[in-house]
Amino acid sequence: MKLLILTCLVVLAVARPMVEKISESEEHVTDVPENEHRLEINRYLRPEYEMMNLYYQPFYWSEEMRNLKMTSLPKDRRMAVLKSVVSDDMLPPLQHKSLSLPKPKVLPLSHRQILPPHTLRMVPLSHKLFTIPKREMLPISERERLPAHERENLLAHEREILLAPQREMSLIPEREILLAAERVVLPEQEREIRPDNEREVLAVHKREILPASEKEKVLPLFQERVLPLHRREIVPPYQRDTIARREILPVDQRELMPEVVAVDLYPFFQPVANFYYPAELNEKN
């Protein structure tokens, strides 16, 4: 028993310095890397209070402004933004004076000068009445009624305004003014018409003005030859009563299709096969 106790004491005495040495080495290992790790983190991250300042305080504020609250800003700091860059001497004096513009004088019309409503719309403002000649105040339809000797006395720009609608109408050919069903024969179709049928080249409304005796002399196009489909619309209205309705109508895709024959529909019953009964019962039924 004594021998066992002695061996234990010897083992403890030998093991004590080894345990202390191991513990010291562990402390050294744990302390040094932690300090080095913190130094590496501090290189890239700012302290906590500086990180909070980035969110709650603008980075362009000065150090004095950071220490002050928003409610206790000095007056000169608050009003510095509102000061104008331009000095008062550079500003024009009109800003300090109210603009007094003369009111336009409205001259009331007398009882004789009262104009119809369509003319009043074209009359310019009252302050321009004295600078515009009287003929320009009239609408174009009334200006065209001037006689020839008065038109010569007009100025150049007045004559241009007067002749503008007539010049525009002259550019439009007569066949374009007519309706689609009353157009004149096209130039490429005039070659097919004989010279004795010159009156057929006239517009439809001019052909209808002819007396009845002369109308009979003019052979309609559909009697001279079989009309092509694209020339059916040229037939005048007084001759359409003698022509079938199908020949007067313009060409359409429906004309080329055959007529649909009406078929009487009759019911078509199919034999009923019941699932729950055999075929013999269905035949009896």
From Swiss-Prot:
<dbReference type="GO" id="GO:0005576">
    <property type="term" value="C:extracellular region"/>
</dbReference>
<keyword id="KW-0597">Phosphoprotein</keyword>
<feature type="signal peptide">
    <location>
        <begin position="1"/>
        <end position="15"/>
    </location>
</feature>
<keyword id="KW-0494">Milk protein</keyword>
<comment type="similarity">
    <text>Belongs to the beta-casein family.</text>
</comment>
<feature type="modified residue" description="Phosphoserine">
    <location>
        <position position="23"/>
    </location>
</feature>
<feature type="modified residue" description="Phosphoserine">
    <location>
        <position position="25"/>
    </location>
</feature>
<keyword id="KW-0964">Secreted</keyword>
<comment type="function">
    <text>Important role in determination of the surface properties of the casein micelles.</text>
</comment>
<protein>
    <recommendedName>
        <fullName>Beta-casein</fullName>
    </recommendedName>
</protein>
<keyword id="KW-0732">Signal</keyword>
